[in-house]
Amino acid sequence: MTSNGEGGEVVAKRRRKGIKELVQVALRGGCLAASATAMAVMLTATEEGVADIYGFKLTLSSNWSFSPSYQYVVGACAGTVLYSLLQLCLGVYRLVTGSPITPSRFQAWLCFTSDQLFCYLMMSAGSAGSGVTNLNKTGIRHTPLPDFCKTLSSFCNHVALSLLLVFLSFIFLASSSFFTVLVLSTP
C-alpha cells in the first residue's frame, strides 16, 4: 500500500491512464501543428516564370487560389486547425484540472465521430490536391505541353510539402481516433 492507502495495482492503472491522456493531448497538438503549417505553406505557394515551348516564351503565373483543389485543401486545413485547437484546449484544461479527457461514453463517441469526420476530410483534401499536383508534375501526356513544375519548381515544392503535412495531419487524427476507441473499449 502507498502512503494514501492505495494499492500498487490502482496506482499503476492510474499512471497508464495518465499516459494515455497525455498521448491524446500530444496527438491533438501534433495535428494542430501539421494542419496549421500545411495551410501556411499552401497560402505562400505562388510563383511566376517563363516557359519555352517550341521556341515561344510563355509567361506562367501560379497561385494556390487558381485551383479549386488547392482551395479545398486550405479550407479543410482551416477547419481542422479550429477543431484541433478546440480539442487541444479542452484536453490541456482537463489535464491541468485532473479530470478525465473523455468523462463519458457519449463524449468519447462524439470525439470518435468528429475525429473520423476530420480524418476523412483531410484525406479527401490531400487526395484532391495530389491529383492536381501530379498533373502539374508530369504534364499532359497526349499534348506537347511540358510539365508545369520545371518552370515553377518553388510553387510545386510548396504544394508538395503542404500535401505531405496534410497527410501527416490525417495520421494524427487517425491515431487520436484509435485512442478514443481504446477509451470506448474499456469498461
Curated annotation (Swiss-Prot):
Q: Does the keyword Cell membrane apply?
A: yes
Residues of this chain annotated as glycosylated in UniProt:
N63, N136
First-listed, main subcellular location of the protein, grouped into a coarse class: membrane
Domain of life assignment: Eukaryota
Question: Which keywords are on file for this protein?
Answer: Cell membrane, Glycoprotein, Membrane, Transmembrane, Transmembrane helix
The chain's Extracellular topological domains, given as residue ranges, are: 46-71, 129-162
* GO CC terms, sorted: plasma membrane
**What residue ranges lie in the Cytoplasmic compartment?**
1-24, 93-107, 184-187
Annotated signal sequence range = none
**What's the short name of a Pfam family annotated to this entry?**
CASP_dom
Segments spanning the bilayer are: 25-45, 72-92, 108-128, 163-183
Keyword Signal part of the UniProt annotation: no
Q: Where in the cell is it found?
A: Cell membrane
Q: Which family does it belong to?
A: Belongs to the Casparian strip membrane proteins (CASP) family.
Its subunit composition reads: Homodimer and heterodimers.
Protein name according to UniProt: CASP-like protein 3A2
Q: Which organism is it from?
A: Arabidopsis thaliana
